Amino acid sequence: FRFRLLVPVMYGIFAGSFIIFYVLGSIYEDRILIDKAFYVWVSVFSLFHISVFWSFMSELFSKEQSSRLFGVIAVGASVGGLIGPSITAIFSVSLGTDKLMLIASTMLLIPIPIIFFLQALKTKELNNEVLNTPISNQSIGGNPLAGFKMFFSNPYLLSIGVFILLYTGISSFVYFELKNLLSDFSRPERSVIWAQMDLAVNILAISTGLFATGRIVTRFGMPATIAMVPIIICIGLLVLAISPLLGVVMILQIVRRAGNYAVTRPAREMLFTLVNQETRFKAKPVIDIVAYRGGDMITAWLFTGLTQGLGLGLAAVAAIGAGIAGLWTLVGIYLGRWFERDNDNFKNSKT
């Protein structure tokens, strides 16, 4: 199967899946099983299609180009986060919620011609033909589960997985802390607070991605860049342990989300410019999905055990979270140093 066709075919499958769910929902009156299947699929799709997108980006751009451009590219996610809810609000009233799946399918088909255009630019404008054999001349084959073997047998990929696992752990800690503190507020008040935080996150993420991320990587290097948000979160959780106030948790949540969109996520995706095509398209989705969902599950159990099992309060849980953030920082520094070494043997090796 040609690498050139892999990403367009994946987007075609994504688009087709929404059409299938729409048709099934129209045919069958009893939709309980269909709705459950759709929920499971969306939970996987929400991570998988983003993973495929970033695999494609790390295929197009060199290490140096990714350092300059990935922050700007990531702004698209923040802009989409602003536009998406507006589209849903407009068309859900006039078309109904079911037909929104057709709109989602159409929006997934639009990038396909853009993908072919960008593939042509790789050698014509970006001058990246030296990164790999031209995409059209390579095939992907072998065991479709090879990504799991690549992940668990390669220390670099394992470290990326641990980094994602710790990120999801911190995310869950901050979210649960915030949720507990907001429990005393009414539902309208909570809605206003969440909306204000979302607005702050989008503004901060877009401005940072456009004007700062590339400069941060270029000036301070990858170790400092990828460890920047973890360090800030670690310090913030220590402050929260001393002063368990709602304002502190809100700031932590805003910094964590905006920092992930604008700095941590782009920096993390730059790490995959060092690996070969096979690893990029087989192991990366495994890392993104398994580590992310696994981190969610483990952290939920841990938080429940600490609060309900051991009866720990906000301050104690924040202190434990600070320790996790400290470990997250160390893993980030390790990955950043590996990235800057740019081991050519790793790039061309079989994983």
What is each stretch, according to the model?
Residues R2-L5, V23-S26, R31-K36, K63-S67, ...:
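Intracellular loop-helix junctions on the cytosolic face of multi-pass helical membrane proteins
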Residues R2-P8, I87-L109, E189, I193-Q196, ...:
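A membrane-interface helix-boundary motif in multi-pass transporters
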Residues V9, V72, L102-I103, V162-F163, ...:
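Hydrophobic core positions of alpha-helical segments in small-molecule transporters
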Residues Y11-F18, S105-L109, T168, N202, ...:
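Residue-level recognition of pore/gate-forming positions within transmembrane alpha-helices
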Residues G12-R31, F116, T213, I231-L245:
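C-terminal ends and interior cores of transmembrane alpha-helices
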Residues I34-V93, S136-M150, P155, F163-T213, ...:
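Substrate-agnostic recognition of the 12-TM MFS/MFS-like secondary transporter fold
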Residues P223-V263:
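C-terminal transmembrane helical hairpin of 12-TM major facilitator-type secondary transporters
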